[in-house]
Design a protein with these regions (language model features):
Chain B
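N-terminal export/assembly segments and adjacent metallocofactor-ligating motifs
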Residues: 2-19, 24-27, 35, 39, ...
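A cross-kingdom feature strongest in bacterial/archaeal respiratory oxidoreductases
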Residues: 33, 358, 398-404, 410-439, ...
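Acidic/polar loop patches that form or flank catalytic/metal-binding clefts of enzymes
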Residues: 228-234, 268-276, 343, 368-371, ...
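Glycine-rich phosphate/diphosphate-binding loops that line cofactor/substrate pockets in enzymes
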Residues: 327-341, 393-399, 492-505, 566-575
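A generic structural motif
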Residues: 366-379, 430-437, 531-549, 600-611, ...
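Short alpha-helices
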Residues: 435, 442-472, 518, 525, ...
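Phosphate/pyrophosphate-binding active-site segments
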Residues: 456-511
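A glycine-rich, hydrophobic/aromatic-adjacent loop/helix-cap motif
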Residues: 499-571
Length: 133, 857
């Protein structure tokens, strides 16, 4: 009978002495692969000006039409990017985004890249957005 | 052009009209030859070298002229040793062309590579990117890689304003000179030129203000690269992101076909707005051109001061109300007004609006339907001898004669001017009959000048001279002959030109004319056409330069300018007035006071105009971009326009409003769509028979075949998929037509006394019209209010250029700046309308001009 009990617990005991495969998220975070495609980042030059020129090629490349860009003319008083054109509006709809990374490929100025951040369900922000007003 | 020649295109025999350009001929047979500098509407120059082909001719025996045959029995072809430019060739019998050989491919590749050595390739920030001929041809024929070092590229000014409206990017320019040729050859505003040479060759504007042309926007369409772009659309959107809707311009009677490109904009509160206005090809109306007023004058649709809700007068003030409240009030007031109901319809009401308004008024047994502004008349004559169906300025050349009377066409209807001018270039004879010099004078020897007030006598004189002793058998001719006895001899050469013309079109404007005088002038013009037998055939007949985009439609729907004058003159007798999309209080000095007398006034308006401020109920109407409908242009072509943007606020279309009021009055159910209203028009208005919406939306192949896959051929233009419209036939085209002339009854000419001048109000293209002036971009082109005087008169009145003067005419007095111009005839003062100095009379009258300080002293 004891033999039967031991035989029945073999798998359990084996797992007791093995290292656990789960990690204690969010206290512990597992690193992602270097080329992981998470949240997008729009980058700036070292002098603080935006790399994005509002050309909308990312939006054109986007297979799910998640990106919305509106361009405007830089003036000397109000300058966002080095050239004449900048993105007045830049929106990514994360409900639509499929993280394919085509936007990154399309960008002529390397302004948009996909970062490692994957925590996109922001409960507080979402709640505020939903309930305000 | 019926004669054809046979040419061999890639060893395939094709027929092409004799004298046709080789690029066009190939295009006609489905072979695209890439071009940059060649444009089907302009003379070829062979500058860009992109259209290289292999060219050969069949050998002919020098003694006999026979084609030499080879051993295989086929003609021997002598090929040019080098590649030739196709655009500089005209098709001729026995021409052999090869467009697909290795040599041709190589030649095109090298030309593209060469052009790109000086091109910045900044396509991501270029407004042309996505619809750029250079981009497309590089993808099709380019090398894919440049051997040229980037650092050796030439760098020139990138954002150079040629004027306020057009920006030039000198790096992107490939020196095809399409823009320079367009303004020099076609619009004759030689304001652009090349400057410097070699790789620094660049375009400059030589005028002040820069790029001073009324057609400057067209150069941005025909520019094969992003060198010329409009300030209006600067970074507005990428072309592939735009939606488009077919529309019709509302600024003048030409009825240019437009495409409204729209896109959502966060700055506009997430609304869809018009991003740019592009011409839509209609070879019978505007070809591929539009004027700058049409291109840039669309901002009123999104102006922040649009009326968004119905307004009802309570306690002397207009306060916001709901639609049901306002409509109920209007219906109640109309009911109690009984028969004493009148309507004034504005210039941009669609045919559906007009029909619904007519039904509403007639349903109440009202009889007065006025079309605003009541400056021109003669709709009956247009219906009798208007330009016949199929009339097209593009078909007019040698043998045709175009008479322009009492109109500064470039200011009043720029695309008429454009097409008349090009017809004159093709050899059409132009006779310009006017009281003063206009730009059209440059293209003719026949400039007939009259004293203001003698317009009718002048046309009568021309007719007498043109007829000579001939006595056509026409009803009423004997009386007319008797009346013509006293007509002055005017210009024998011009009369000769009219008499000798195979085709004759008379274009009648209304400059300086009262409505009665205009009616007489229209009759005189009709007589000229009928007596010389130029009616009822294509390219013959009468054309009026109406004051509004849909004045013709209003006349067709039974509205008359005579009723409009009657309403203003007898406003007190109207218990209820419906003023739809019109602004009499701002345009007629008598109207503001007269409207105070009227009973209940309901106005539909876009803005709180002076007329709307006088109204008891103001209803927000939709602009042309927010709804569907049809307009009828000056040539009686009924054309559809479609909804492009969402309505502003709670605005409704005029036809909806009138139908809803009618429904409340028990006139029957409101019709659901404008198409249904049109169906009713088709049924009841005989001229419009068969013009239902699907018919009006039909398209047919047009030449040149612009748009589609080959933006490089005609410029940035898209195929017309919105319809070409239909022109209705006039009485003279019917077999039952009885030619008839009548004696025109001209009112007496104004006779200035000592110290007095004839003050002639004139229309300018760039004015402070409520709708046009909402476009900020054009403000610098709208002049300060002025009066133009002859140097002699100015000296006599001691008026200097720029001095403030008081102008008095017909009970109105305004203070404006003086301009001294040699083009103004002696004894005449030209006073432009609509420049923000309040309402002015439209007819020429005796008046005075005096220095302002002197009056005060």
């Amino acid at each position: 009978m004891i033999g039967d009990m031991v035989r029945g617990l073999v798998t359990t005991i084996k797992h007791v002495i093995q290292r656990p495969v789960t990690i204690e998220y969010p206290e512990v975070r597992r690193p992602v692969q270097p080329r992981f495609k998470g949240r997008h980042w729009l980058h700036r030059y070292e002098n603080g000006l935006e790399k994005c020129i509002g050309c909308s090629l990312c939006a054109a490349a986007c297979p799910v039409e998640a990106i919305w860009v509106e361009a405007e003319v830089n003036t000397d008083d109000e300058r966002y990017s080095p050239g004449e054109r900048y993105a007045k509006t830049y929106e990514i709809n994360y409900l639509r985004c499929i993280f394919c990374g085509y936007c990154e490929d399309a960008c002529p100025t390397e302004a948009i890249t996909m970062g490692h951040m994957y925590e996109l369900s922001l409960y507080v922000a979402r709640r505020r957005d939903l309930h305000q007003g | 052009m019926s004669e054809t020649v046979t040419i061999y295109l890639d060893d395939r025999a094709i027929e092409a009209p004799k004298g046709m350009n080789l690029v066009d001929a190939c295009k006609l047979h489905g072979v695209d030859i890439p071009v940059f500098c060649y444009h089907p509407k302009m003379e070829p120059v062979g500058m860009c070298r992109m259209c290289l082909i292999e060219l050969g001719f069949e050998q002919r025996d020098r003694t006999t002229g026979e084609v030499v045959l080879g051993e295989d029995g086929k003609p021997l072809v002598r090929w040019f040793p080098t590649l030739q430019t196709a655009c500089t060739q005209v098709v001729s019998e026995g021409m052999h062309v090869r467009t697909t050989t290795e040599a041709v491919r190589r030649g095109r590749k090298d030309i593209i590579e060469f052009i790109l050595t000086s091109h910045p390739l900044d396509c991501p920030v270029c407004d042309k990117g996505g619809e750029c001929p250079l981009q497309e041809l590089t993808m099709d024929f380019g090398p894919g890689k440049s051997r040229f070092l980037y650092d050796e590229k030439i760098h020139l000014a990138k954002r150079y304003p040629l004027g306020e409206q057009i920006y030039l990017d000198r790096e992107r320019c490939i020196q095809c000179a399409r823009c320079i040729r367009y303004v020099e050859e076609i619009t004759d505003d030689p304001v652009l030129q090349f400057y410097e040479r070699g790789r620094r060759l660049q375009i400059i504007s030589t005028s002040e203000p820069g790029f001073d042309s009324k057609f400057s926007g067209n150069t941005t369409d025909i520019c094969p690269v992003g060198a010329l772009t409009t300030a209006d659309f600067r970074f507005g959107a990428r072309p592939w992101e735009l939606d488009s809707a077919a529309s019709i311009c509302t600024h003048c009677p030409v009825g240019c076909n437009l495409t409204l490109n729209t896109r959502l904009d966060r700055d506009a509160g997430g609304r869809v707005i018009i991003k740019r206005v592009m011409p839509r090809q209609n070879e019978q109306v505007n070809e591929i051109w539009i004027c700058d007023k049409g291109r840039f004058g669309h901002h009123f649709t999104a102006a922040p001061d649009r009326i968004t809700t119905p307004l009802v007068r309570k306690g002397g003030k207009l306060v916001e109300a709901t639609w049901s409240e306002a409509l109920e009030l209007v219906a109640g007031m109309l009911k109690s007004a009984g028969k004493a109901v009148g309507a004034l319809a504005g210039p941009t009401l669609s045919n559906e609006d007009l029909w619904a308004l007519r039904r509403l008024v007639e349903g109440q047994r009202g009889a007065r339907l006025g079309v605003w502004p009541p400056t021109m008349t003669g709709g009956d004559l247009i219906a009798e001898v208007g330009v016949a169906q199929g009339t097209n300025f593009t078909d007019m050349g040698k043998g045709a004669c175009i008479v322009v009377v009492a109109s500064d066409l470039e200011e009043e209807a720029p695309i008429y001017w454009h097409r008349v001018k090009v017809a004159a270039d093709r050899g059409a004879t132009l006779v310009v009959v006017n009281g003063r010099a206009t730009k059209l004078d440059r293209y003719t020897r026949h400039r007939v000048r009259y004293h203001y007030g003698d317009e009718v006598a002048t046309l009568n004189g021309l007719l007498r001279q043109a007829l000579g002793d001939a006595a056509p058998d026409i009803d009423g001719f004997d009386q007319l002959r008797a009346a013509l006895e006293n007509a002055p001899a005017v210009d024998a050469a011009a009369a000769q030109a009219i008499a000798g013309a195979t085709d004759l079109v008379v274009i009648v404007g209304g400059e300086g004319l009262s409505m009665a005088a205009h009616g007489a002038l229209m009759q005189a013009a009709a007589n000229l056409l009928v007596a010389t037998g130029h009616v009822g055939r294509p390219n013959n007949g009468l054309l009026a330069v109406w004051p509004g985009a849909n004045t013709q439609g209003a006349l067709d729907m039974g509205f008359t300018p005579e009723d409009a004058t009657h309403i203003i003159d007898n406003a007190a007798s109207f218990e209820a007035l419906i003023i739809a999309g019109a602004d009499p209080a701002d345009e007629d000095p008598r109207a503001a006071a007269a409207l105070q007398e009227a009973g209940f006034i309901v106005a539909t308006a876009l803005f709180l105009t002076p007329t709307a401020e006088l109204a008891d109920v103001v209803l927000p109407r939709m602009s042309f971009a927010e709804r569907d409908g049809t307009f009828t242009n000056g040539e009686r072509r009924v054309q559809r326009f479609c909804k492009a943007i969402d309505r502003v606020g709670e605005s409704r279309a005029d036809w909806q409003i009138f139908q809803q009021v009618g429904a409340a009055l028990g006139q029957g159910r409101a019709m659901p769509t404008p198409g249904v209203v049109m169906a009713q028009i088709v049924e009841r208005v005989p001229w419009y028979a068969g013009m239902d919406y699907p018919t009006l939306a039909e398209v047919a192949p047009q030449f040149p075949m612009v748009g589609g896959e080959d933006l490089y051929y005609g410029g940035t233009m898209y195929k017309n998929a919105g319809g070409l419209g239909r022109q209705w036939a006039v009485a003279a085209e019917q077999a039952s037509y009885q030619a008839r002339v009548r004696v025109p009854k001209a009112p007496a000419a104004p006779k200035p006394g000592k110290g007095e001048l004839i003050v002639v109000p004139v229309r300018l293209l760039y004015d402070q019209g409520t709708e046009f002036y909402k476009t900020q971009l054009v403000h610098r082109r709208v002049p300060q209010a002025y009066v133009a005087l002859n140097a002699g008169d100015a000296a006599r009145l001691s008026v200097r250029e720029g001095a403030r003067v008081r102008v008095r005419l017909a009970g109105t007095e305004v203070e404006v700046a003086a301009r001294v111009r040699a083009s103004v005839p002696e004894g005449v003062a030209l006073l432009p309308l609509n420049l923000g100095v309040g309402p002015l009379p439209h007819a020429a009258s005796v008046g005075t001009v005096a220095v302002a300080e002197a009056v005060g002293a």
